[in-house]
Amino acid sequence: MKITQERDITTIRQTVIFSASPEQVYEVLMDSEKHESLSGENANISREVGGAFEAWGEHISGFNLVLQPGRRIVQAWRAHDWWTDHYSIVTFDLRTLDGGTELRFTQIGVPPHRFDGHFRGWIETYWQPMQELCDKGSVSDQTRGASAAARQRIDQGSL
């Protein structure tokens, strides 16, 4: 008997413009305390290639594949309720614009039943709160800030 198994996977692509420098955007994503300011949840993020990370109160975990400060982050990334051995690959490419940063985001390997929730989740629990921090001019020093609604979406599996 021969059994084969396939997992359908999907890709998310989003482009976001922030009114902060690429270095500031990079730091919000890679610094544990700043990430906690964004999410309002615990984060433990290694700053080393091969190092592990956990975010959103351990709902998200993975490890760093490529780290180029102020330019690029590539991570093997998974949600706690995905298939045990399944990681997606997330890429954050940062580019300087006049007065800000263009972030090109790609997530390859999202389970199809989670696509809609993750697509919205990046917007609602990362990009919108990051823009709010940028608009306040406090990307680098904002204290815990995610809304209760954003945390509830994480708890419900939207990201």
Spell out what each predicted region is.
Residues 109-159:
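A conserved amphipathic terminal alpha-helix motif
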